[in-house]
């Protein structure tokens, strides 16, 4: 089995917000290495159930091995948390006591060259969470027009140099396909004027983020998964979501606020006709972030933001 390493971010804070109860049914929609799931399983005890979902077969296998001691209390499923509603239906589960989504790419995926996520390691430009299906990042770079590439890099990477990078990609691929991570990283670094290179951020960071989001349809998955998760929660059940960049965090914040809002009728209406009731109580007015001790131990935790909410009756 492929060795899988990953440090669970905000583990203590997640447990405080999720507050798992003995005998409850919980779902970890982004299983990863199984660190968060292990903590939940320890709390819910032998009468509880934790369902772990992941698109990555390597993550699923590693977590299943790590959590084997919990026996039938742990149920691993390969799939995307965006398909959460269908996966729960297949398993015959109607309601949940709690749900966790950790939206970050795992340390293992970033540090494994053949996965193609890292601009620091040379490997095939893949970036698929599930390598058995879908187009790779290299496919996108080869097939998309300059305009489409600009839109992807600008929208998903919030990159100010998106147009220039997209044009350079199209010019380069006419001579040679862009198929490796370092090939793309060098291209982006050479396109952005050196005086605009940031000290602590590699110049290709935003472009790689944008391609990864596009390849895996991450933002669509986030919205679908959160909406389905809220619908599946019991009254008093909780949802906790860890995001790692502003695009994800904005979606989480918006969906939580939307679900926590009641009547949306105009003030001039004499009575409510929308019949909208608040579904959630937001538990985190501001996102919870990692403290200095955790960020010293795991620098990738610096950008993590945790938001949580509780389902109303």
Curated annotation (Swiss-Prot):
- Enzyme Commission (EC) number: 2.1.1.199
Compartment(s) of residence: Cytoplasm
Task: Specify the superkingdom.
Answer: Bacteria
Q: Where is this region: Disordered?
A: 289-313
Gene3D superfamilies registered for this protein in UniProt:
Putative methyltransferase TM0872, insert domain (1.10.150.170), Vaccinia Virus protein VP39 (3.40.50.150)
Task: Kindly indicate whether the keyword Cytoplasm belongs to this entry.
Answer: yes
Identify the keywords attached in UniProt to this record, alphabetized.
Answer: Cytoplasm, Methyltransferase, rRNA processing, S-adenosyl-L-methionine, Transferase
Q: Which GO terms describe its biological process?
A: rRNA base methylation
Q: What does UniProt give as GO cellular component?
A: cytoplasm
Annotated S-adenosyl-L-methionine binding sites: 34-36, 54, 81, 102, 109
What family is it from? Answer: Belongs to the methyltransferase superfamily. RsmH family.
- This protein is called what? Ribosomal RNA small subunit methyltransferase H
